[in-house]
Amino acid sequence: MVQMNDVKMVYGNTEAAALNGISFTINEGEFVFLVGPSGSGKTTIIKLITGELSPTSGQIAVNGFDMQGIKRRKLPKLRRTLGVIFQDFRLIDKMTVYENVAFAMRVVGASNKEIRRRVPQVLELVGLADREKRFPAELSGGEQQRVAIARALVNNPRMIIADEPTGHLDPVRSLELMLLLEKINELGTTVLVVTHEKELVDAFSKRVISIDAGRVISDGLDGYYGYEAE
């Protein structure tokens, strides 16, 4: 699924490494939290997994793709195996809930028949079947995040990457969101959650990879965050 072996990332002409010898493996079907203080390298790891960046050195494999020098023409195929959920939702204001989710299928060339079949299924899964005709401005923050999850999930990715998905949600909605991601994982999708939410991480017995200063400092199954909440 994801393999990083002694990965180093240096931006531009800077001497300090954003990542300095990162190694870990995320297997098919896992649910993993990636945690660490601000500036520790979490965002860089996401960009390397999605092909937005290439490593300075080391080896990375994602869903069978060798990310060291991956050809630009192969990036769309890689990214179809990934569903990314952003903290700021990134919904299209002029599109309804249904249209926002359907748009993710249209950009990869799905037929209208496929869209009509798949979109209602995903909206049902995330609990928004009765909101399909609403616009983003008519939804709560939690509902908007569920639309973002539906959009990330609609093309059947092998892996969901959630980048600070609870950043704009209250504690109750944050817990609901994590339970939804857990349900998606139980259905077979690998889930990687990048978060600062110590309470959420400690509440779920999942694997936690902790990084600091561009290095993995712990990797365990005890579900413990390991940092003071920021």
Please give the residue ranges for each predicted region:
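Conserved ABC transporter NBD signature motif
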Residues: G58-D66
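Catalytic Walker B motif of ABC-type/P-loop ATPase nucleotide-binding domains
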Residues: I160-D163
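Conserved ABC ATPase signature
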Residues: F135-L139, E143
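A short, flexible loop at the N-terminus of ABC-type nucleotide-binding domains that lies
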Residues: M1, V10-G21, K71
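Short coil-to-helix segment of the ABC ATPase nucleotide-binding domain corresponding to the Q-loop/switch region
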Residues: M95-F103
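Helix-to-loop junction immediately C-terminal to a conserved catalytic motif
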Residues: T50
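A short, proline-enriched helix->beta-strand linker immediately N-terminal to the Walker B motif
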Residues: V154-R158
